[in-house]
Regions:
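Conserved N-terminal Rossmann-fold NAD(P)-binding element of oxidoreductases
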Residues: 8
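Local cysteine-cluster metal-coordination motifs and their immediate loop/turn environment
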Residues: 11-24
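A short, conserved structural fragment
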Residues: 356-378
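Short amphipathic alpha-helical interaction segments
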Residues: 342-357
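Short solvent-exposed loop/turn micro-motifs enriched in small/polar/acidic residues
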Residues: 244-246, 354, 378
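Short, amphipathic alpha-helical interaction segments positioned at domain boundaries
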Residues: 389-412
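A generic structural motif
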Residues: 372, 380-387
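C-terminal scaffold of the Radical SAM
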Residues: 2-5, 24-53, 57-342, 411
Length: 412
């Protein structure tokens, strides 16, 4: 058994951002060198264990995230080379921050086998970057994207909207500058204020204004209009790409493929059969029978402690419906038929009709065609229900409706 995707987590940054609640440690100089080296040694042992178990043989995508992977310098290159010695993924992404993405490191990562770089730009306004606690400037970010492109990487840029003090004009300027860099991919996220972060404390103390959710929604819609007008098509609620440049790794997450996560706070997801084939890597779940899907998060550096969650068939299919509604391709007829095998078809149709009536989903065919396909009277393929513009903007409502299908709360 081999998983479809591999995620590697690097829990180090040169400095923590004001909004960040990720499992990362701020470290520099000799402290980063010693802590980072010890972490990488443990991580590589886990990679080798996975390779010996045959789990990496057919990996199609690899993603190294953080934290800030590029703070590791040459040790990051060692990780890439080690992984490449066990598999030949079609997409190999590494996250990078502009201030630590040097020409020397970019060249080494390219030669080691990284194919795609995702840059944590967040904003191209220096005042907004300072508020977020970012330690790079807008000009550094622009140079980093240019460097990545010159090394032959497929490039992605992360941006955040709805920042305190951010105006529609400054947001549009950031989007314009990002497009001018000719990046292949842009991810756009509304700012989330997490409890316990410096940003949260500043808002509570009245030093910073709380994000306006209505303005965030407007900014997300402006991003849609501007990015699609510049050749970047929306393929997921927060993701835009040029043709053929979609993030395959994230699509694997959204389509229920199995993935292995290695490193502190890395998440894995398996079917019960997949888990049985690689249980020696975890040794934490005695009997996964009855579980359709198993999700686990590594809690330590060594890979000896995990938080485990199991999903029933009904929960797994409700989750797949929810994830399908995040993507422009929407919910397929095949997924709908599989869902109808464990969720009462009348309940399923009731929820879809409610979403359509609310303007959150659009159907590719008539209701009669949909009902016939569900009853298996007609064999159909392709998408059957796709998110509308309203569905994108009111995603939380749509996703909640579909996830609620995992419960038996209403009779069919």
């Amino acid at each position: 058994m081999s998983v479809d995707s591999l995620y590697i987590h690097i829990p180090f940054c040169h400095a923590r951002c004001t909004y960040c609640d990720f499992d990362t440690k701020a470290a520099c100089g000799s402290q980063l060198l010693s802590r980072g080296d010890a972490y990488v040694q443990k991580l590589l042992r886990r990679v080798r264990d996975a390779a010996r178990a045959g789990v990496l043989e057919r990996v199609e995508t690899v993603y190294i995230g953080g934290g800030t992977p590029t703070v590791l310098g040459e040790r990051l290159v060692d990780i890439v080379r080690e992984i490449r010695s066990y598999c030949n993924p079609v997409e190999f992404t590494c996250e990078a921050n502009p201030e630590s993405f040097t020409p020397e490191l970019a060249f080494a990562l390219s030669h080691a086998g990284v194919t795609r770089v995702s840059l944590g730009v967040q904003s191209l306004d220096d005042d907004e970057l300072a508020l977020l606690g970012r330690i790079h400037s807008s000009s550094q970010a622009e140079r980093a994207v240019g460097l990545a492109r010159s090394c032959g990487f497929s490039t992605s840029v992360d941006l955040i909207c709805g920042l305190p003090g951010q105006t529609m004009a400054s947001w549009e300027k950031t989007l314009d500058r990002a497009c001018a860099l000719e990046t292949d991919h842009v991810s756009v996220y509304p700012l989330m204020v997490e409890d316990g972060t410096p940003l949260s404390r500043a808002i509570e103390a009245g030093r910073v204004a709380e994000p306006d959710e209505d303005l965030q929604a407007e900014m997300m819609d402006v991003a849609r209009s501007l990015l699609t007008g510049r050749g970047l098509e929306r393929y997921e609620v927060a993701s835009y790409a040029r043709a053929g440049k979609e993030c395959r790794h994230n699509i694997a997450y959204w389509t229920g493929k199995s993935y292995l996560g290695l490193g502190r706070s890395a998440a894995s997801m398996f079917s019960s059969n997949d888990y049985g084939a690689c249980a020696e890597l975890f040794d934490v779940l005695d009997d996964p029978s009855g579980a359709s899907r198993i999700r686990m998060v590594q809690l330590d550096d060594e890979g000896t402690a995990f938080d485990v969650e199991t999903l029933s068939s009904r929960e797994a299919l409700a989750e797949d419906l929810m994830l399908g509604a995040r993507m422009s391709r929407g919910i397929s007829y095949d997924l709908l038929r599989r869902a109808a095998a464990v969720i009462p078809p009348s309940r399923l149709l009731e929820t879809l009709k409610e979403a359509v009536d609310l303007g959150l989903l659009g159907l590719s065919d008539s209701w009669d065609s949909l009902e016939a396909a569900l009853s298996c009277d007609v064999s159909r393929s392709g998408p059957c229900a796709m998110p509308t513009r309203q569905g994108w903007l009111m995603g939380n409502q749509l996703y909640g409706m579909l996830w609620d299908l995992h419960e038996d709360a209403r009779s069919s």
